[in-house]
Structure formats: C-alpha cells, structure tokens
Amino acid sequence: MEIFDYENVLLLPRKCRVESRSECNAGVALGGRTFRIPVVPANMKTVVDENICAWMAKNGYFYVMHRFDLDNLQFVKNMKAKGVYASISLGVKKPDYDTVDQFVAEGLAPEYITIDIAHGHADTVQRMIAYLKQKLPASFVIAGNVATPEAVIDLENWGADATKVGIGPGKVCITKMKTGFGTGGWQLSALKWCARVATKPIIADGGIREHGDIAKSIRFGATMVMIGSLLAGLEESPGKTVEVDGKLFKEYYGSASDFNKGEYKHVEGKRILEPIKGTLADTLREMEEDIQSSISYAGGKKLMDIRKANYVILGGDNAGEHLLM
C-alpha cells in the first residue's frame, strides 16, 4: 500500500473541456439534498454555532452542528422554524439515547444525524445506529470516525448511510502523540484505502490545510470533506477573539481538549489561535471557485470528474504505469 498525505501528492491536468471555470459544477448530493460544494465545517464548538448552521442551510451548504452543551431538541425546533434542514451530532451514551426518545415523543426527526465519537469502530456505535434506524428511520445517519476498510464495511453493514474517515489528522488533534494510533501524516492514503471498499459516501475528516486538498480528497474517494482550522479563523467563528501584538485571532480547540471538556481527563486535543482571515461567505465562495478550477484542470465539468485525474507522489518512485497513463 502506498503511504502519502496531501502535501505529497499532485493531480495531473487533463485536456480542458470548458471555456470558463465558472461552467464547472462543484455541487454534490448527500442524503437527498444537493449542496453547493463538498465541504462541511467541522462539528466543533469553535467552528460552528446555531447562527452559522442556519446561514449555511439557507445558502445551500451542508453543516453538522456540534454536540457539546447543546439542547439538540430545541436546536432542531429552531431550524424547522427557520424553514431549513436540521443536522445534529450525537454521542453513544444514555443522554444521547434520551435525546432520540425526545425526538420520537415530539414527532420530530432531524434530516441528518452524525454519530460523532473519536473511535467510531465500536460496539457502542453499532447499537446507536440500530436504535436510530428503529426510532428515526427517515434520518440520514453518518457514523465515525474510522480509519480502516474493515471499519467502513462494518459501519455500512450496521446501517450507516455514510462514514466519516479520519482519526487524529486535524490541526488541534493530538491523538497520534497521546495514543500512538491514527491517520495523522497519512490521511489521504487512509481515505484511498477506505474508499476502495465503501459503497456509500465517505466524509474525509481532518488534515485539510489548503483548498487544493479538497480536490485531492474527492480524487481519492471522498464525497464530502470536513474542515476545521480553515473555517475556525473567520469573523463569524464562535471561538473567542484574542488580540496578540495588535493582530486578531480566533481561539480554536479540539473536541477532546480540556478546553472543550472543562476537565483534564482523556485529553486528545489542544488549543491554538487561528488568524482571522475574512468572512464565512467570502471563504466559501473562494473554495467554490477553487474547486471549479480543480474540475477544469481535471478535464471535467462536474465534481466527480476529478476522480478521472491521474496523480504523482512527490518523492516516490511513481513506478505504477497507471499514474502516468
């Protein structure tokens, strides 16, 4: 198996078939809806809040609300009142089952539910998927996070409608250092490996540092890409604004950090400061334009045409003929 990450790979251009990049369609379908771009902000407290989620939904983007210090029932009611879809996160503990029961009692069903735990290839996840499929069969269930083909096969067989791939590649994740496990440093290879066995959508989660990494993720099998740090330093980001030497930053921390947990126990995340770099709308528009450019370089007109592009591994022997054919 080839081992590489985003910075080690470049995609090879194919003959352009459009007169303008704006002709390229960066849209992607997930769970019966089509979204403008294959990007979803990380479901973290310093990346998304209710206002950002509502704006994303109204403007044709996918979102997943975080699950920390949140009344999920009220959140879904608020989203329904605004006339937009609801997309929430759940864990696998008793309060999460209670939340599902509350939805059933109220006759409410979020359109999307993400089972969001650090090690998603688990019996606890299997039980939660089964419970959701029984109680809220209309909801589209995303489950994760995982790192191996075996895990993707299991989650799909258990009933997940999509899987989230990536353990520890994020900028504020220290799972690799704390545990010795994860996809940090080879996330793109892990994605390729998992996508080979997947029959349902994969959301690549973590390790995205540049907009070009979105296209690389699509090329190696992702349907959607979850991004934290690039969307944490925006004017609207919910993280606390901090001034250092006259420059403005946003606080950004991992979901398993002591900053998020409020206690120093089983910590696998850290806190950093992200420079403020513009607005959400401008950033997403730039991402869309860059993805359109990627599609044109791939010789395509729609997002999945990127998968037809060949690639080279920088520093590798590139001996496989398929790379350059």
Swiss-Prot record:
The gene is guaC. This is GMP reductase. Keywords: NADP, Oxidoreductase. It is an enzyme of class 1 (oxidoreductase). NADP(+) binds at residues 202-225. The keyword NADP applies. GO terms for cellular component: cytosol; GMP reductase complex. PANTHER family: GMP REDUCTASE. Catalyzes the irreversible NADPH-dependent deamination of GMP to IMP. It functions in the conversion of nucleobase, nucleoside and nucleotide derivatives of G to A nucleotides, and in maintaining the intracellular balance of A and G nucleotides. It catalyses: IMP + NH4(+) + NADP(+) = GMP + NADPH + 2 H(+). The active site is at residue 173. Its EC number is 1.7.1.7. The keyword GTP-binding does not apply. GO terms for molecular function: GMP reductase activity. It comes from Polaromonas sp. (strain JS666 / ATCC BAA-500). One of its GO terms (biological process) is purine nucleotide metabolic process. Belongs to the IMPDH/GMPR family. GuaC type 2 subfamily.
